Amino acid sequence: MKILIIEDEPALRELIQRSLEKERYVVEVASDFYAGLDKIEMYDYDCILLDIMLPGGSGLQLLERLKELRKKENVIIISAKDSLEDKILGLELGA
């Protein structure tokens, strides 16, 4: 299973990456909006772990781009932001 982690906080990103790799998942990472955008446009993943607040743009914008590309990756939002509006929009966009 190939997983993409798009998270700007290095400690959290590395913790998730190590945990998944320990379970033998293939993991790629991106630390900002543009790096994440490049990866979702170029590659296919089984699952994307996506932060909402990213340098350069939002995770919700990346969800919109996935929808435009008609990609079917499973998306799990990981965020400290606790906005009901963001949760609803994320679900509407396929997370």
Task: Give short role names for the model-derived ranges.
Residues 1-95:
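N-terminal/domain-start alpha-helical segments
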